[in-house]
Amino acid sequence: MSISFDLTIDDTRDQLARHARASLEAKPSLIGMSREEMAAALIAAGVPERQVKMRISQLWHWLYVRGVSDFADMRNISKDLRAMLAQHFTIARPEVVEEQISQDGTRKWLFRFPPRSAGRPVEIESVYIPEEGRGTLCISSQVGCTLTCSFCHTGTQKLVRNLTSEEILAQLLTARDRLGDFPDKDTPDGAMVPAEGRKITNIVMMGMGEPLYNFEEVKKALLIASDGDGLSLSKRRITLSTSGVVPEIYRTGDEIGVMLAISLHAVRDELRDILVPINKKYPLAELIKACREYPGLSNAKRITFEYVMLKDINDSLDDAKLLVKLLQGIPAKINLIPFNPWPGTNYQCSDWEQIEKFADYVNAAGYASPIRTPRGRDILAACGQLKSESERLRKSERLALEAMMIAGHGE
């Protein structure tokens, strides 16, 4: 039995108006800023330049080690400076609209972010998967997706917009809030908190959207997440999954340096063109070449290839043989993913016996090929099942919202 908590209380129309008025007075968030951006913002707000380096160090600790979401909780910063920071900036969390808890302990959150420009509030989903000895947070990078992979529920939701680095990090910060994963108020100020005992030990960019179509914001967020003076997640515990945006794959290794996962799902171009349509732009030969050239690739830093098992589509032993041949010489792990059904799909999951035969062949060829245990299926939190109700604003709605904002500004 799954548990669902609907955390909304406002009428949608009233909430839209409230967000529209708030956007007129929106303050920039310090969350998601690089140190250089934060320095410029603090100087512009009136912080003396000689103090900036110290203030950044203090803020970084409070935001990313202690996880505070209110300037008033920053106890080693003067009351006057806290008031000035609150006047110019925000560090607020997104609204948690709904929290669902699966029978297996998986948690899915629906987060709502305020509008940007003439947009509307948007919603995205994040998923926490607890396992023995580790806990993985699956993070979204876009609202919706452009890729329309035919087996993926998210692909049925048109792209609304990219998420900012703040919104990407906010998923991690809010999840840690909900799980009690930040230190309590009795922890001494300035203390670095050990990683042992953390509920979130790994993050995967495998939620809604294609991360490499939002490269700069994803890069900024992941560099902050892996910063040793803050959230301090090892880059070996951060995995970025792409459907194959070839030009950005090398940049991912060179500029971010995290683990790479490829949503492969087919070993023949004619089939992958259907399952993962970006293959028409970047076919298998180009994708595999980019993987072979991934910076830092080694047995200690393998690429994960994700392969959803679709009955009578891509699950034959011939497919397994072609898969081994395709990846020959690449340090790799192959995750076999039983297809997770969603409303309206025409695909079926491969029979378990067939999945095991496929896995046995790949294993015998020297590639680790674990069969992923489906998690959170009962709350549509499993791989390929995420989707929110956010849509791109129609022109008539955009004009109405702009009028509402103008009216609000005149109050």
UniProtKB/Swiss-Prot annotation:
InterPro entries: Aldolase_TIM, Methyltransferase_A, RlmN_N, RNA_MTrfase_RlmN, rRNA_lsu_MTrfase_RlmN/Cfr, rSAM
Protein name: Dual-specificity RNA methyltransferase RlmN
Family: Belongs to the radical SAM superfamily. RlmN family.
GO biological process terms held by the UniProt record: rRNA base methylation; tRNA methylation
EC code(s) of this entry: 2.1.1.192
Any one GO CC term of the record: cytoplasm
Note: Reaction proceeds by a ping-pong mechanism involving intermediate methylation of a conserved cysteine residue.
Residue ranges of coiled coil: none
Pfam families associated with the record: Radical_SAM, RlmN_N
Compartments in which it is found: Cytoplasm
Function, as annotated: Specifically methylates position 2 of adenine 2503 in 23S rRNA and position 2 of adenine 37 in tRNAs. m2A2503 modification seems to play a crucial role in the proofreading step occurring at the peptidyl transferase center and thus would serve to optimize ribosomal fidelity.
Domain Radical SAM core: 131-380
Annotated cofactor note: Binds 1 [4Fe-4S] cluster. The cluster is coordinated with 3 cysteines and an exchangeable S-adenosyl-L-methionine.
Keywords: 4Fe-4S, Cytoplasm, Disulfide bond, Iron, Iron-sulfur, Metal-binding, Methyltransferase, rRNA processing, S-adenosyl-L-methionine, Transferase, tRNA processing
